[in-house]
Amino acid sequence: LLMPSKGLLFNRSDKSRTYRANLFSDNNVLAIINLSVYRKFLFDHASGPAAAIIYTPKREDINQPIVYCTPKPIYTIEDIRKFSIDPTDICRIPRDIIDDDRIWKIAMWGAPRDLELIGKMQSTFAPMASFIEENHMITAEGFKRGNRKHQCCDFEGLPLVEAKSFKPYYISSDELPTVDFDDFECIVKNAREIFNAPHLIIKQSHKNGRFLSEVLDYDAVFNHSLLGIHGEIEQLKYLSVIIGSRIFSYYHILTNRRWLVERDELEAGDIWQTPIPKPNNGELAEACNIFDKLVNSPKENHLLEQFARNMYRLKEYECYQIDDVIDYVYDYFKNKRRSVSFSRPSIDSYKLYYASVKGVLTRTFGTGAGFSGDLYVGDAPLSVLVLNVEHPTTKDLNVITNNDQLNEILLNLDRSLVDNQQMVFARRNLRIYQREKIFIVKPAQRKYWTYSAACRDADEIFEDISKAWR
């Protein structure tokens, strides 16, 4: 069955939830192939992204997980005649969590640990809508000109904030045009306060993966592509700092039903559902101080990032997860074949991967287990990390580079790991288990040697070993 992926996987309306529930209860769904990223390659004239479902009518309950595959282009000549499947494009969704609306988007771009982090954020912090209600704020989208059937002179001469020239944090009224028209479709009759100072104005589309907002201390109007919030200026500045953080972008990359599926903007309802920590007076003052500095230096956002991560009480490994999604997932979506995801890793990247996979395995198996590592890298398309199982050790990663014989071996191995069927280009990563060694063989591309990749590989190694012990 081929159908729109948005309705099947990402919409959260009651109608869509009922359809998904009936689909899974009335049939044995074996696999779902989410073709959203391939929309432009496979369906030139499609009005929306598609998904394919492989299923049989239900005769008896089955317990095996649903295979969920999200193939993604590799932006080479192979994309013209085939579609590509990477090992990270395939996951197995346990049937006891298929009713979780979040799983399909997170599994599309993230990893199991991202589901944990998103769940932690949602369970720990109330949505922005609650923050807005508790602080008696007023929200709405701006006016809409549309069919221009209604005449209204209320906005004439007021500063006009426009999405196309939106400036983050603050813009002087002298820099803005003024309203010189009086024809509208919608004039925001019931929430006019959003145009009154002080107000926070949020741009619903992002710029380079970040969402922009500004707090103005003068009255101004704007159209429906911008959101307005009227309230106390300290709380508005706090929200602006949170909205500008990588955490805000990370959350919506992995939960929003439109972004990285078909459109590059958020709907108002999605923004209001963002988990927001409740600040105390000291934290409000700190946010205002950071905001005021950003007005003069909008690119100096390291203080903003540190503040936001402290507010969300993130641990170091959770910060790595967030950075990986922005630096690699979003960068892949934006820059395609020019993405840093496809570039060769630095030795420091390999060392971070090694330290991370070693740390996860040591914590999982206990402090009695120790690992050292040998890394084989060269000019070949593959890199090999050998984990030596031994007593606890503080040895650094041993790096072996540019051996002609090694390069030849890795080139031949790379060819053997590609399943080159007529219409499918599938690549397999390789793990080999020996009594005292674990071989991890993967392409020499940065996306395979990140912190998040290390956590995923370590979890799968533990699962493989646990199955062997049974």
Over which residues does each language-model region extend?
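Signature of N6-adenine DNA methyltransferases within the class I
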Residues: 1-147, 221-226, 264-272
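Non-catalytic DNA-recognition/assembly elements of restriction-modification systems
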Residues: 3, 100-144, 156-157, 164, ...
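Generic recognition of stable, solvent-exposed alpha-helical segments in well-folded globular domains
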Residues: 3-4, 11-14, 18, 24-27, ...
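Flexible loop/turn segments at secondary-structure boundaries
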Residues: 8-12, 39-42, 62, 167-170, ...
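Short, solvent-exposed loop/turn and secondary-structure capping segments
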Residues: 12-15, 172, 253-255
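Basic, amphipathic alpha-helical recognition segments used for DNA target recognition
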Residues: 60-62, 193, 224-273, 280-286, ...
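Short helix/loop capping segments that flank catalytic or ligand/cofactor-binding pockets
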Residues: 63-64, 169-172, 210-214, 237-239, ...
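Polyanion-binding catalytic cores of nucleic-acid enzymes and NTP/SAM-utilizing transferases
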Residues: 100-228, 232
